[in-house]
């Protein structure tokens, strides 16, 4: 053994080796998605969105994005809800998104963003926490509210970014869709810039994200996104 050969601290090498492996795995898990995105090593397809939770809101949202050639997939463990998404001709995954089967069978490299939008706020936060390291902490979003919490301080530890500012609950979004709220895609031009867009929108319009000419998606609630510009397509 190394100890028998007189190597100093030989007994500690096993512990050092274990610690090195553990740190390597941890860093790999938390940086793989963001690093691949930064180095442009992800799938050559356009950036897509993984929705967790099939509902009138997510189905309408996904249909509008699909019309803009944004890859979308809705995952849900409820057959009745997922069937509605299938009838809307959307790609679906039937099963528990937090299961081992989902991690093995879903090609997550297709998705640069995720929206957790079930009727369970705690579950939405759990999903975002689980997928954050792989997709990117700043690119996992959720609906709902977490009472008694400083949301900003929790963004990079528990849960996801709020999809809306201020946050909206599942019930609020469902009622909006039932009342006729729908998604629109508006392309900005030199003549019709963001200022004119904002001035002509009806009260209650929410800008959720915009699609860059490159296909990249920027979410309005993300700090540092700025404002959409010429050539961008706003989803509101």
For each feature predicted by the language model, list its residue ranges.
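Cytosolic regulatory regions of ion transport systems
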Residues: 1-236
